[in-house]
Amino acid sequence: MYSVEDPSVGSNSSASSLPFGELFQGMSFPGVGAQIMGADDKYLLQFDENVTKFWGSRHELALGYTFTPKGRVSPPMGEVNPQEFVNRVEEGFQVTPTWHQGCLRDNGKTDYAETVPIARWEYSTRPIYGWGDSGAEQKSTAGWLAALPVFEPHWQVCMAGGLSTGWIEWDGQRYEFEDAPSYSEKNWGGSFPLKWFWIQCNVFEGVSGEVALTAGGGRRGLPLVPGAYEEVAMVGIHYDGKFYEFVPWEGSVEWDISTWGSWKMSAKRDDYEVNLEATCDSPGCTLRAPTADLGLAPMCRDSFFGKLKLTIRNRSSGKMILDTTSDMCALEVGGGPWYNSWKTSARVQEPLKSLLRYSIDVERVFSPVPQLKPPGL
């Protein structure tokens, strides 16, 4: 899990010079962070306030950083071949949609979790699902407005499911794997929501083919209305090449999430309905998340040992499309306060609800003026 905050974003002068920059003014906590939650819920964090060695692609999911270069060699400022990375980087990482490589050393600043001193890895990834039907144009995760700097934060599932092959060295052990299930997403903006939950699973029992579930919800700020928030959630499932998306502007989405240990969601649209129930007996691991007033802070709790039951049903015929379970579900709660269970249904305010029902190709809109094209599009 990588995070970076540009020190210029908190500056009014620099922010206002960027397209849509006035939406991002506020406090600044510059730095680059890399976190790993590994086997046995152990943890590693490396963080550096110097962001000058960070590089990232403006319109692709490609990024990297050098915490410590080898000797006097200059750090890479873009993707390099694997051997060149080894020759030039002592501690750092590089990530693209198909390649992930790095070495991290824990900085010793975590007193609430059992940490691992060092981790190394190299693996390639073959994407299976993006966010949409296989072979079709892919979608924005939360509707076309999510492609613009409107909501806080902005969320895009880049690869709902993929297969990775390579190795990871963690806590003194080397793990080699072939076609291991993988997932990647990006978040951008100033901070995570005030409160949120997340469910993700790519490993299921009793079903043929690749299945990928991603669901989440949060209390997020409304654009250009300081102090106003809405509670929204969505469910997305890829199965047998088809994408089943459940969003509150096309139907109903409800959830009942406990402070820890139980995640329940149900959603309906005109043609399908989905139900999912997840539980977790393990205590999980506390991770850091971007916040508006504290920077990267320990604000969320995760586990990869969740038990999940997932069903999709055709509403008109009653036919069961998918009925499956898993004992390797990723579960998360974050932000707060979490005094008790969070039980509610999604409510998208107007005029956003009506706007999201339109199908707009944002990339095509910006093609005549590429200099205004938002990052990540």
What are these regions (language model features)?
Residues 1-377:
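Structured soluble/peripheral alpha/beta segments that form catalytic or ligand/cofactor-binding pockets
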